[in-house]
Amino acid sequence: MDDLARVLVAHPFFAELEPAHVTFLVGCTKNVRFRAGDHLVREGDREDTLYLIRQGGVAIEMRRASGEVVCVETLGAGDVIGISLLADAPAHLDCRARESVVALAIDAACLLRKMTEEPSLGLPIAMRLLERTYERLSRARLQHLDIYR
């Protein structure tokens, strides 16, 4: 297993995948860095990358009708950005580095192609993406309830 495969399998999102599946994804993956203030994703952009955060923090932000930017969630090491790539829809939030960020960037088209070619890989990844989506929606719901008490 090469270095990039080791880094992939060490991330919680892929921790339980079979080594052969991780090796299968290495060709879709590269290491990336962002400086504080850099956008990983902008509202309205196509989500063409799945980011696995290794170090640093990312603010998930939205704009109110007034133009005010509100941080709705912060993510850090072990978290994932780009979970809606399966929906093939534009991003509805901004994702901005709060500090220096080190991440793995997985090309969405390559990932989706590999998921289709290898269903024993595709289903576990789709399930992980759905789990992350559910977790985020649950946290957003709790935040919303807390605001209106």
Task: Mark where each language-model region is.
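Cytosolic regulatory regions built on CNB/CRP/Popeye-like sensor folds
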Residues: 1-149
